[in-house]
């Protein structure tokens, strides 16, 4: 027996047979051992062959085990396992059969044929199941066709379409493919190309997520329903699984052999099979090593002659990177562009998929949720494409609601925690014997009984609601199953059964679902539901917030009031700049009300004024208000961009330069936090060419970084600060604010009236007109007066108070001390910054010495007052 002439699977079967005989201590390796090994092979051809004949491989396997158990065992040092003469004859016969069939190698089917032709118990067992040489040969012809065994792994080329492809038409017939809404133009174009005589190979090109694969699935559904031209009726649409083709191809040439078998099978179908190759670019280079042919080169001849009809799908970037470089491959495919559907089309697609997702998750999805998913994803998720991102939103929102239904309700959880707390207290009181404890125990037991009763009622209500939701889900699943059956009966022409379902069972089930839904809504109005089963607009907004960090949750009445009072919130930290605060507040309100231009940033402002008047503080306060986090402020010091080449630090270095993969400081910050406040400090210090990148940001709300990615700035607030015109502002008459405790000036000096024009004139000398023209507002920050400094003193001292509270020390500052600090910290030129230094020097330094000396400890209340010409500290006694 020359095992070199055996295939890999046949050699494995012989080795497994020997191992089995040795393990069972059998003296000889016989046909039973070999047949057992052949049936045990996972990816072998024998089990499918026996099934094709009509016998049961499992039954044969069990019978063989019984036979092997009855065989005598040989033990002892002299025991050896030999090959039985009958098995040697069977192997020799298998070799003769291989030569007779002009096969180069002995395969597993030759061994089975040889065993069936022997005069042994194994052959008789096979014959009893109808497995004879004739039935084996007939079944083998169906599986193998006219192929010869020319390699040591022929099994990989048998039934290759079933192994390496998914039958989309079968899936469509079984309604296992989601419905495809719209895309009629693209499907018609694909059918048009497929109907050509040569080069009948369309390739779908589009951005990821626009629905390229869905178009092919739509074509499969049309083929099944017969809504296609005559040339495509009855065709099979198979999706090639390139991963399965490559997997397990250990030796050189195995991959090419498998792919060749697929191509030949498609060619032999005489146009009956259309091959769909998803991610077409993966063919280029697949299987190639050391200059050997790759998959795309194997496909080219068949594609050019029109013998292989295929549909490709790939993204624009991959098509340009891989397919366009291979001109010979590119010309064999006809391009079909798939554009992103509009918002209206996406809403229609979601409405078509709505029922599928409702059945899967067991919840109801409101129409407003579908509209919100489309509109909000289009507005806020800019790095992905419709309809994919909208479908994902609905799917995750429904999944989140399903988890809430299956988890214990919050109200019930709170009652459980309260009961646990009361039980702990009760256990503690039982140890006490004083009258007060006994009285408290009586009250506690009554309270505990009330909570236990409430918990029992809530648990019953929860189980009832869960039961109703589960019942509704079962009804919907049954309804979907009946609809699939009705479609299949209609397609097969069994109109009686189709009519029975359409006019009998389906309407009856729809009525049950309607009554159950009405009952749920009625009960929710009366007793207040513990569980929600409807996905609404608010759920979609929460998922958007989780994905992007953008607070787009629906504005409640309290939140609306919060934005109406925005000025007063900002003025608590930004003093004396009423006009600037009002303008920025109006911009935020316009955005929240949905009135702002969605193609531009939320607001872009140039703040000019002297140092220390609140320009940077306004940006910090705004970030804190919008996100409850000052870290949402991205601050870029423009004095670092005084050279022309420094622009690459903002948007990232171009290809070929050091740092290309790192990205830009500005673009990366916005990509990670798309909803943020951008502060460009001291803009006049940057190089003039740096401002060119602002033109695109301010006008279109977008910027392309060094790697070609488009970064969205539409959800940012851009604040630029500058000290231009500071000398004019300082020389103007003391400005006054419109706060309640400060009088409104009746007249303005000539300098104050001409100040805005002077500032604008100076800005035109520093910045180009196209830059200034794109800014929403130029905010002139006025210099701070003594009264303003007095108000800022309160704000700064409050920060000191909060810092001391962490050490459990209270601080009270008298008015005289505040007035002293305000006077020491007032500087007409430097704004509020000297005040901070004065508080550090006069108050914090002295206070630190007192605390470290041990004079004041935790729990103390320190009073700060004036003693002669300096601050003094005393401890307040209760």
Curated annotation (Swiss-Prot):
Gene3D superfamilies: 1.10.8.60, Clp, N-terminal domain, P-loop containing nucleotide triphosphate hydrolases. It is found in: Cytoplasm. Residues 6-71 are annotated as: Repeat 1. Residues 391-525 form a coiled coil. Residues 159-340 are annotated as: NBD1. It comes from the Bacteria. The keyword Transport does not apply. Keywords: ATP-binding, Chaperone, Coiled coil, Cytoplasm, Nucleotide-binding, Repeat, Stress response. SUPFAM superfamilies: Double Clp-N motif (SSF81923), P-loop containing nucleoside triphosphate hydrolases (SSF52540). Residues 784-878 are annotated as: C-terminal. Residues 341-549 are annotated as: Linker. SMART domains: AAA, ClpB_D2-small. Residues 559-783 are annotated as: NBD2. Homohexamer. The oligomerization is ATP-dependent. The Clp repeat (R) domain probably functions as a substrate-discriminating domain, recruiting aggregated proteins to the ClpB hexamer and/or stabilizing bound proteins. The NBD2 domain is responsible for oligomerization, whereas the NBD1 domain stabilizes the hexamer probably in an ATP-dependent manner. The movement of the coiled-coil domain is essential for ClpB ability to rescue proteins from an aggregated state, probably by pulling apart large aggregated proteins, which are bound between the coiled-coils motifs of adjacent ClpB subunits in the functional hexamer. Belongs to the ClpA/ClpB family. Part of a stress-induced multi-chaperone system, it is involved in the recovery of the cell from heat-induced damage, in cooperation with DnaK, DnaJ and GrpE. Acts before DnaK, in the processing of protein aggregates. Protein binding stimulates the ATPase activity; ATP hydrolysis unfolds the denatured protein aggregates, which probably helps expose new hydrophobic binding sites on the surface of ClpB-bound aggregates, contributing to the solubilization and refolding of denatured protein aggregates by DnaK. This is Chaperone protein ClpB. The lineage of its organism: Bacteria, Pseudomonadati, Spirochaetota, Spirochaetia, Spirochaetales.
